[in-house]
A protein has these predicted regions:
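Extracytoplasmic loop-helix module adjacent to an early transmembrane segment
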Residues: 18-50, 66-70
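Membrane-lumen/periplasm interface segments of specific transmembrane helices
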Residues: 18-22, 30, 37, 171-174, ...
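Specific aromatic-rich, kink-prone transmembrane helix
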Residues: 91, 131-153, 298-302
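Multi-pass, polyprenyl lipid-linked donor-dependent membrane glycosyltransferases
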Residues: 117-137, 158-167, 295
Length: 395
């Protein structure tokens, strides 16, 4: 019961602060970019033929759920996103408790919940996205990997929301061929392979259903887009995106990388999923951080495994510096700014504190000089933290 109270209290606190402090985006009447297409689909579902720009037109799951809410389409999507963001916290709690020392779980959840990119914060700025229910489906699928029927059902529903959910069954299938050890693991690999095949089939079925019920207004070539970003995404911007998404907690992971590597060796399916996420984040588009967030359930476990190797009672100074760094980089107490391309430059301290344009927060910021400074700050802080952790381990 206590764990549920912690999740509820954390969700309530973040939601209350966001309601009071975070103004929603004003661009395109508050609908944003892809959100305008999802809002259009929500208004069409059950009333008229569904159509929107490609590839957004095939992500019909969340808009059709929003159509069931007796509110205008935008508010319906917002409602689905708020409920999904709360559900996600409970799902993450269940997921982390399977792999991480229980005492660390509330801290990992708090760091996730307060980060400006994660759903409990982000849906109050961008209410019409479908990423939040998709992330719920990803974590739900991770929890059900060895139960084929339930796993397939989640993959089917998830693929209707966003095709990214397929990273879970694809990773599970790859991992099932690597688990070649004791008989109990071989049996587990067989169950996982069955679930993975069922999940892939269900996910593909979901994508086919989406293409039968919704048609594109424009043409979009996924191979062309992937080819473009594979060639044109700057490597340093890609590295910065990892720091923006996960902050200086990556230093903990780097300092005790063997603990994280042991986890991935024990569960190769998660390693395969991370590889898929890393590739998609590179070739998927300019929103690198949004793609990396799909791997956050696994990254959080890896950070937890590494953090468990540190005696935090003897490293309170380290803990204080790390906590401050996480709060600053995650903008725990700073709002997400609106869309204002003409906004003045905002120099960063990990994050640009005074930024008045949301693009300045991302790795694809138009101000690449500012991005270079931010990356240098992240690297410098990480070097200090890794050295500090290593010193504590020796003392």
């Amino acid at each position: 019961m206590k764990r549920y109270l912690v999740c509820a209290a954390l969700a309530g606190l973040v939601i209350t602060l966001s309601m009071v402090l975070q103004p929603p985006i004003s661009y395109n009447g508050g609908l944003g970019w892809d959100g305008a297409q999802y809002t259009q689909l929500a208004g069409q579902c059950g009333r008229e033929p569904m159509h929107a720009y490609e590839p957004f037109t095939y992500r019909v799951g969340a808009p059709c759920l929003a159509a069931l809410v007796p509110l205008p389409p935008k508010l319906g999507l917002w409602t689905i996103n708020i409920l999904s963001s709360i559900l996600l916290l409970f799902l993450l709690d269940a997921w982390l408790r399977q792999h991480v020392h229980l005492i660390l779980v509330p801290y990992l959840l708090a760091g996730f919940a307060f980060h400006w990119l994660t759903p409990l914060r982000h849906v109050w700025w961008y209410p019409t996205s479908v990423d939040t229910p998709a992330l719920c489906a990803i974590v739900g699928a991770l929890l059900l990997t060895e139960t084929p029927v339930a796993f397939a059902a989640v993959c089917l529903a998830g693929a209707l929301i966003r095709e990214s959910v397929l990273i879970v069954p694809l990773g599970a299938l790859a991992g099932s061929f690597v688990r070649l050890a004791p008989p109990n693991l071989v049996a587990k690999a067989g169950r996982m392979r069955t679930s993975a095949i069922a999940g892939i089939a269900a996910g593909v079925a979901g994508m086919v259903i989406a293409r039968l019920v919704s048609t594109p207004d424009t043409h979009y070539s996924l191979p062309d887009a992937a080819y473009y970003w594979a060639l044109h995404k700057p490597p340093l911007a890609y590295l910065l995106a990892w720091f923006i998404t996960f902050g200086p907690a990556l230093a903990v992971l780097a300092a005790h990388w063997k603990a994280a590597a042991a986890f991935l060796a024990e569960f190769p399916e998660y390693a395969a999923m991370l590889v898929l996420v890393a590739i998609l984040a590179w070739i998927g588009g300019s929103d690198t951080e949004r793609f990396l967030l799909w791997g956050s359930p696994i990254i959080l476990v890896m950070i937890g495994k590494a953090a468990d190797r540190i005696d935090w009672r003897r490293a309170r100074g380290l803990l204080a510096v790390l906590a401050i760094g996480l709060a600053i980089s995650g903008r725990w107490f700073l709002i997400i700014p609106d869309y204002w391309p003409e906004a003045p430059r905002a120099w960063p301290l990990l994050t640009p504190w005074t930024a008045a344009h949301y693009e300045l927060l991302f790795s694809h910021t138009p101000d690449q000089a500012m991005a270079a400074v931010a990356l240098g700050e992240y690297v410098a802080l990480s070097v200090v933290l890794v050295g500090w952790i290593k010193w504590h381990a020796r003392s």
